[in-house]
Every structure is written in C-alpha cells, then in structure tokens.
A protein has these predicted regions:
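Short gly/ser/thr-rich secondary-structure transition/capping motifs
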Residues: 1-8, 59-63
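Short, conserved "active-site rim" segments that organize catalytic pockets and cofactor/ligand binding
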Residues: 10-57
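Conserved acidic residues
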Residues: 16, 75, 111
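Conserved, mostly hydrophobic/aromatic
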Residues: 19, 78, 115
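N-terminal short beta-loop-beta anion/metal-coordinating cradle
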Residues: 49-74
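Solvent-exposed alpha-helices and their adjacent loops that cap or buttress functional pockets
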Residues: 9-12, 69-72, 139-142
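Phosphate/ribose-phosphate-bearing ligand recognition and processing surfaces
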Residues: 83-156
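Short, basic/glycine-rich phosphate-binding loops at helix/coil junctions
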Residues: 72-85
C-alpha cells in the first residue's frame, strides 16, 4: 500500500474514518484543552467522542481505541496514544499507533482512513521524521483501501 500525502485539514477529508492523535487517556478529558486535531473534533464534532473515549480508560502508549464520530461525517474516529505522560512522541509510539490504528480499520472493514502526523504537534516530533516513520510502517501493512496522511494547513 502506498499512502497519499496531502496538505489540508484532516476533518475535511473524504474518508470513512479519521485518526486522532490523543494521549494515554489517564487525565480526564474534561480537564484538557484539546489542540490540533482533538480541538477540531471538539469544535466541529462535539463532545460525544471524548465522553465515549473517557469511558474506555487508560490507553497503552501506541494503543488505539475506536469511538463514534459525534457530529462529524465519518463512520468512526480511531484515537491513538501517540504521546507519553510527558507529552512526547517517539519512533516506537508513532509506529505502534499507526499499526494499531490500521488493525482496527481492517478489523472493522473500513476502506478509507486519514491520519494526521502523529506526535508532530503536541508531541514535539519533527514533522519530516514523523512522516517517514509513518510511511515506513504503513508500507509494511497489507491494506486494500485508501490511506491518506494529512499535513495540517491552517485556514486563512
């Protein structure tokens, strides 16, 4: 599989499921001020995905969990724990996040998925390095559907 790299807003992608780069889910979601993709999900999709996520409990580093999309036009959201408790990403957390998100997508039969650059925002990972880790991992996974990696482009 060869992922397509695009520039834009993940929330505007025409896919069945999006990936949200989240945290370990040990701090109650309502105590956090979501940024990046999480902030966009909250603003445009409402609180339902985060309430559902909060009921899932802690997520292992690199783990992934599925929630509904709230008011967003997707079938679901896959939240990945791409950053550790110190809010930092690593090669392992990024690769594990990609692999576990794809495992959920395949198990659920989704044919299209869009990823942000996991760990490149809040996680302080260098975007080019994170992109390479993600590409390497995605290329090693058998998937017949469409995979997009979205580099954020702000509005305005």
């Amino acid at each position: 599989m060869e992922p397509v790299i695009v520039e834009g807003d993940l929330i505007d992608e025409d896919v069945e499921v999006i990936v949200n780069a989240w945290n370990r889910n040990v701090i109650p979601w309502w105590l956090l001020l979501p940024q990046g993709v999480s902030g966009a999900i909250k603003r445009r999709g409402g609180l339902a995905p985060f309430r559902e996520l909060g009921r899932k409990g802690p997520i292992p580093l690199g783990g992934a969990v599925l929630t509904g999309p709230g008011r967003l036009p997707f079938r679901a959201i896959i939240h990945v724990a791409g950053i550790n408790l110190l809010w930092r990403s690593s090669e392992r957390s990024v690769r594990d996040s990609v692999r576990n998100a794809m495992a959920i997508a395949r198990a659920k039969g989704y044919q299209s998925i869009a990823f942000p650059l996991i760990g490149a925002g809040t996680g302080s990972g260098k975007p080019e390095r994170v992109l390479q880790w993600m590409l390497d991992e995605l290329r090693s996974i058998a998937f017949d559907g469409k995979v997009r990696i979205v580099r954020f482009r702000g509005r305005g």
